[in-house]
Amino acid sequence: TRKMIPRKKGTIIFTGATASIRGKEGFAAFSGAKQAKRALAQSMAKELAPKGIHVAHVIVDGAIDTPWVNKLFPEYVKEKKKIDGLMKPDDIAQNYLMIHNQPKNAWTFELDLRPWVETW
């Protein structure tokens, strides 16, 4: 923010998960951390908006087609790829860029991204 405040522009995007808005049995620590991150993003959004800095929180709910996911979950990936059920990094990036390019009169604070087959 040191460089953004004098310029009166900039974008900070936090990445969360469904746990940012909803807890689940066995995920107390994870949910608590994600909800705290969301609260930090909300506070920063309110503090920095008057200074021209756009702060957003993106919930990414679903597996992302990366080498790491492909290696750890090969059967899951195989099934999801049959139905276009994995998120692609470039598609996620397009949404982040869309947030960055929004005009000040129509800023998004929160965006949920998930494959069409994800249950939520």
Give residue spans per PLM region.
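Short beta-loop-alpha junction of Rossmann-like oxidoreductase domains
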Residues: 26, 53, 57-73
